[in-house]
């Protein structure tokens, strides 16, 4: 009762090999017994938004194996649509491909550059993209310049055809492999219906 005082506005999603005749009485017993009112469920916007503008923070700590960890995070408002989520995926994949060549293979400055993005629709429709890597104290400035230069280049010139094709092939293969995975369907349904 403390955790679920009111189930109004809840959406329950089931995926997988489920016999509806077996599921129905379980839903009626366990979910149907949760009280619900006519009052719509709302959330509290605590206004904890990312800081606007550029922020540089440097932290130092003693370590047995000295290293420098670099983390860039870009945020902003963006309509929460499947098309925008897909565009962000293409961008992160294209940057990952470029950094693999320019930062890891050509400079040998890190084991890898992680690039990942996400979108949100509550409390506002936003995106976030993070670029993160570890390196040594001698190479951090040089690698940071390369990372930002590649980002500017893709913003001004767009992605390379080969980056688009590689990403398309990866996404198609990932989708085909995921068709038999419950998690794929759950993520799709949550993305499609989660934002209303």
Locate each region found by the language model:
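Short amphipathic C-terminal alpha-helix that caps PH/PH-like domains
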Residues: 27-31, 91, 144-152
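Active/ligand-binding-proximal structured segments within catalytic/core domains
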Residues: 72, 82-96
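Hydrophobic (often cysteine-bearing) scaffold residues that line and stabilize catalytic clefts
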Residues: 23, 87, 143
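An aromatic/glycine/proline-enriched structural segment found at the starts
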Residues: 6, 11-68, 74-77
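A generic secondary-structure signal for well-formed alpha-helical elements
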Residues: 22, 30-38, 98, 107, ...
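Solvent-exposed aromatic/hydrophobic patches embedded in short alpha-helical segments
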Residues: 91-95, 99, 175, 189-190
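M16 family metallopeptidases and their MPP-like homologs
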Residues: 1, 8-15, 67-83, 104-196
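Extracellular/periplasmic bilobed ligand-binding domains
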Residues: 25-29, 88, 103
């Amino acid at each position: 009762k403390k955790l679920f005082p009111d189930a109004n506005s809840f959406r329950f999603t089931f995926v997988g090999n489920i016999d509806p005749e077996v599921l129905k009485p379980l839903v009626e017993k366990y979910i149907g017994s949760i009280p619900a009112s006519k009052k719509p469920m709302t959330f509290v916007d605590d206004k904890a938004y990312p800081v606007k503008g550029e922020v540089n923070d440097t932290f130092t700590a003693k370590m047995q194996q000295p290293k420098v960890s670099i983390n860039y995070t870009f945020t902003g408002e963006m309509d929460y649509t499947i098309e925008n989520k897909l565009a962000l995926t293409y961008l992160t994949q294209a940057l990952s491909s470029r950094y693999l060549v320019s930062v890891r293979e050509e400079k040998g400055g890190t084991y890898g550059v992680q690039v990942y993005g996400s979108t949100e629709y509550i409390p506002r429709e936003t995106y976030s993209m993070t670029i993160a890597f570890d390196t040594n104290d001698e190479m951090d400035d040089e690698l940071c310049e390369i990372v930002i230069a590649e980002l500017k280049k893709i913003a001004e010139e767009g992605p390379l055809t080969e980056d688009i094709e590689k990403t398309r092939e990866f996404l198609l293969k990932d989708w085909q492999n995921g068709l038999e995975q419950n998690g794929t369907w759950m993520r799709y349904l949550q993305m499609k219906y989660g934002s209303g």
